Amino acid sequence: MVSSSSDIELIEAQGRIWGYAYTYIINKCLKCAIQLGIPDVIHRHSPGPTSLPALLAALQLHPSKHDAVRRLLRLLVHAGFFKLEQEEKECNYSLTPASELLLLFPDKLDSGDDAFGVWSSLSTWFRRSDGAAAAEAILGMSFWDAMARERWAMPQFYDAMTGDSKLVARVMVSDYCRDVFRGVGSLVDVGGGTGIMSAAIAGAYPNISCTVFDLPEVVADSREARAIGLPNLEFVGGTMFEKIPHGDAILLKWVLHNWDDENCVKILKNCREAVSSSDKNNRGKVILIDMVVEINQIVANDKDFSQVQLCSDLLMMCLVNGKERTEAEFNNLFITAGFSGYKIVRALGPRSIIEVYP
């Protein structure tokens, strides 16, 4: 093949390819830093930064590894997980919002590594002619069945979802999102898991009756939320593909991206029926927390989440035949399910709050 690009352009392209190919190294190095306890040591030295000698003394590593720690931190500083303050020849480190988050929720980093070997067999899946998700085709069972078979996997998944719900709930019940719940008297959290999100909403809004709706075996394991003892919080077992309890607002946090368009329309139709049955004046709404993929971003910046959205889209495609959707794709779902309008509030990093109206 004769290239139309100059040698300089090809060299630059090579570097760009390397940059994407090596991103897994950041994940592995960050996990290593957490396992060594580096964020904990720096946190204990706060509010001031931690010098490299003080960090090394606390880690109690063999002297042969001291320069390796410096080089590990150099990469993680560049990736934005630590901040470097250099005074003459001494390196001093402090936490950034990203590492503070990992200190609070260390499972944020854990994405299941290669998800049962799915990624390494992806090209094999592309060559198949059936419609099974990559995970199902490669594992011989659904991703969820594979998770249930491995004793460590499902608890790890629910721990990650619980940590995420705690973080998202803090934003949802803040003044920043107060308008979302204005005029809502009852709320049904569909696929609400063990009730962490609903418990936060019920605690912040005593006037809202909150119902956690999920599979019976899921809501049965809701000790943490039940222990709070909120009188306006209840748990109901069932399936969103049959009938959803009535409510002024129906909440689906990170649910639709697990499903293809056909199943999403079924879920949304049941949500519309539940809202319409509750509010005869059609003031009700469905509240979605999901990614809205933006593919028009040209210049990357700290608030550009295009890469994580696109990676998440492929993750859902491979694991469960789901997808992350653009605004146009969401609009098509809403129209097909019989809704009249929607509003998007980009308030949760790579995710958005979408209010959908009957």
Regions found by a protein language model. Give the residues of each.
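Conserved adenosyl
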Residues: 2, 107-305, 341, 347, ...
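Conserved Class I S-adenosyl-L-methionine-dependent methyltransferase catalytic core
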Residues: 2-186
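C-terminal lobe and adjacent flexible extensions of AdoMet/dcAdoMet transferase-like proteins
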Residues: 21, 353-358
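Amphipathic alpha-helical interaction motifs in eukaryotic regulatory proteins
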Residues: 39, 43, 56, 123, ...
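Rossmann-fold NAD(P)-dependent oxidoreductase module
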Residues: 75, 200, 204, 333
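C-terminal alpha-helical "lid/dimerization" subdomain adjacent to the S-adenosyl-L-methionine
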Residues: 287-337
